[in-house]
């Protein structure tokens, strides 16, 4: 069972972000890329297309959303918790360690402590970040000099907001942020997501 979007199982406490009260005020929009065919595999990857994060990550995302709102922006989330089975599906399609974590080691996404996101302006238009989400190219790297000055500034804005809120970043993906201690959280599978809340 669930209460207020909260689920507890052996993996710890998870939140459905669209039901997490602190983020349900419009500061965050969710469009999970792997819940639809609109991703690099060309097909849906998720069995459960709800957007989950662990409590620690959800709290830091709340802080980041507050900081973004001060600048007149809000977030669009492309991905959050990615069950281990989904990580295997992505890896089997494109086994590129620069852009995908080897599922044998485990991804921060598969632990519920990573988020892929961008910034939207007050009209809901995504800021220019120089590449699309999941563009597996060096232009996706932080600090890439081949993108426009405006896109570089937008990436720095996102980096500043997320860093101030306590997130770590991945140097090869401008959209990816994670907690600093991801391996301290257990991996989450589709089977574990289906387990009822523990008392």
Can you say where each PLM-predicted feature lies in the sequence?
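Extracytoplasmic cell-surface/polysaccharide-interacting catalytic and binding patches
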Residues: 1-80, 92-172, 180-199
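Segments that shape or occlude catalytic/ligand-binding pockets
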Residues: 83
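Short, well-ordered surface patches within globular domains
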Residues: 86
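Conserved metal-phosphate-binding beta-hairpin within the catalytic cores
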Residues: 177
């Amino acid at each position: 069972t669930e209460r207020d979007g909260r689920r507890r199982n052996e993996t710890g406490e998870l939140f459905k972000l669209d039901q997490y009260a602190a983020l349900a005020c419009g500061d965050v929009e969710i469009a999970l890329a792997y819940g639809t065919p609109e991703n690099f595999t060309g097909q849906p990857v998720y069995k459960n297309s709800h957007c989950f994060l662990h409590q620690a990550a959800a709290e830091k995302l709340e802080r980041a959303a507050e900081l973004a709102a001060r600048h007149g922006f809000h977030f669009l989330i492309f991905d959050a918790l990615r069950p281990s089975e989904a990580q295997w599906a992505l890896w089997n399609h494109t086994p590129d360690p620069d852009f995908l974590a080897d599922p044998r080691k485990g991804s921060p996404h598969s632990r519920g402590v990573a988020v892929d996101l961008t910034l939207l302006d007050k009209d809901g238009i995504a800021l220019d970040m120089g590449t699309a989400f999941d563009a597996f190219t060096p232009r996706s790297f932080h600090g890439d000099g081949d993108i426009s000055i405006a896109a570089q500034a937008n990436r720095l804005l996102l980096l500043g907001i997320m860093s101030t809120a306590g997130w770590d970043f991945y140097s090869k993906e401008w959209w990816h942020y994670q907690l600093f201690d991801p391996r301290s959280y257990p991996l989450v599978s589709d089977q574990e997501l289906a387990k009822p809340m523990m008392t």
